[in-house]
């Protein structure tokens, strides 16, 4: 605990942007609001290495005698770096006190565009097209004068002596608390749920044909039927239908419950009329103990709920209020001990201890042997039926897509009815796949794909829940781990003699990639670590603090660098990537410049939408930067065709491999798996299938298409290191399922599942180099 004398650092709550710093007398650093406050001049000789990182206490002679190249290719070192650094870093982020209330940083591309349109409509102005957006004058940044003290010139942490210089573009939305696009200003019922059109009854009135609205309760005229008029209500009471009162809205405004995006399984007719209240995910007993009224957690199981009591009106009124987060002091202290006091082994995952990992597979099998054996035997006995069902579901999905493409609603609805009978968000991989694709086809058929996708993006899922789901995915899937090891090892090899390393990260998000690199830099040189500069680039968040998320990432990395005695400087940029100028990056002479991106270029629009595409604009920007090395990791997919049926088939093949991978590694009832599939894969599928034009932001290309694009942009490819490729293959073969593939094609590192390529990484330099 000695490394945190002032307690465990929070995030924005502990930042005082107007506070003067008491600097240690031994340091020669200078403080300037314009140029920033850096760690390179600090004297760290008086700092004791933290106990949480025993590698810092190794004998200096051992470190001095290590060859850098030999240490870099150590198989156990790479695994330890990732497990002890990245997963611990994720757990540390989860432990921040206000993480439950923060918005997620993983996805917001289309929500930003929709919020901009809404702002222009509110101002009575016309929203500019994407091609002319850069030439339009925008309102001044509010971050510099924010009443909470945030500023675009510099963001200071009074715990770690560092500064993050922030550049926040004016292309962000000022939506206050609940900004919605114009088409979301029309209220939707709280029981908004995907429903098969041929099986559903009217959600609100209990009568009417299911073909009247695709979702049971939709937009426009269908919404009017959800709100009883006085004469209709009187007629219902005369008939003695007391159940009608249950469907009346209890407040003056209906709200969107996007969690109802998951349709019910067999009891959809009964559940369709229920109104669920958004609450924190806690045990049912804890809800009653703290007087937090909520229905039983049966939304994912599809079981009929009998939760109705006298306080229902009060609960439904409370559902429109912001939920309060309550954590007992003893529980918080215990979690602090687990994250801060850890031994030389791998740290314990404190927030999701039961998630399955490769190393814990044997222990899990021993403790739950009977249950797991039963599942496997059941799966084996029905293997032939599963294969037949998979083929049938894929055929039905393709036929349904063809019917939707020609607006054959009768055939499409019949196909959807058959798909619904054999699909479920809790089933096997093919059933889950069919469930999300059926949802997307329904959305496209109703013309509400953009609304649903943006509602899912605007949904108030806490960053903590999203990080837990992401952590579960990282623990069982080697794709991103291998890409991070490939990029970090290449950086270490290229920067062996550099005094200053400047990493420009497009899509830094929470910065999961960099703790392992920082740890390696601290041990790489006997004379001390080189200075590390990171420019974190992200899209602006909604609200009055568009750069808050990317700034907090810088503060976490600064604290990590301070513990490892690595001089550090951070520059935060929150704006549309195609509008960034070279001057915003603050390049300096003599530094080794590395441009990095981890699977985020797929969200940039291409030339099929705009002549001057953002995808080419970003590549031109990188070429102007003239980096020493450019390391892109891309999602290799072919579902970017403008023709719907072709795109649908390719997306179906791609996500079939992804869902099959999750099904083989994670339990079907795993809550984190459910959340990850819904929040990541489910949203992506909705965007690919149900959105068009600029609203379709999921636009992956194959690695061969990216190779041609990068060559046109003025780059040439570097060969891969044979020893690194061999080590990565050994790691995957020995530590993960045999169906994970790692291969090399030309100068590309390819990763896939059962022969289908999913991700690719490579090294590039400017052609003139």
From Swiss-Prot:
What InterPro entries does the record tag this protein with? Answer: TF_GRAS
* Taxonomy, superkingdom: Eukaryota
Region ranges (VHIID): 470-536
| UniProt region (SAW), positions on chain | 690-765
GO terms under biological process: positive regulation of DNA-templated transcription; regulation of DNA-templated transcription; response to photooxidative stress; response to xenobiotic stimulus
Q: Work out whether the entry's keyword set contains Transcription.
A: yes
Tell me the PANTHER family matching this sequence.
OSJNBA0084A10.13 PROTEIN-RELATED
Record region (Leucine repeat I (LRI)):
391-451
Query: Annotated region PFYRE: where?
Result: 593-687
User: Can you list the GO cellular component terms from the UniProt entry?
Assistant: cytosol; nucleus
Q: Which family does it belong to?
A: Belongs to the GRAS family.
Name of a matching Pfam family = GRAS
Its subcellular locations are: Nucleus
Segments of this protein annotated with the region Leucine repeat II (LRII):
552-584
Q: Where is this region: Disordered?
A: 1-23, 128-157, 279-320, 364-388
Any idea which GO molecular function terms this record carries?
DNA-binding transcription factor activity; transcription cis-regulatory region binding
Q: Sum up the protein's function in the record's words.
A: Probable transcription factor involved in plant development.
Position of sequence motif VHIID:
501-505
Q: Which UniProt keywords apply?
A: Nucleus, Transcription, Transcription regulation
Q: Which stretches make up the GRAS domain?
A: 384-765
Tissue occurrence: Expressed in roots, shoots, flowers and siliques.
Q: What is this protein called?
A: Scarecrow-like protein 14
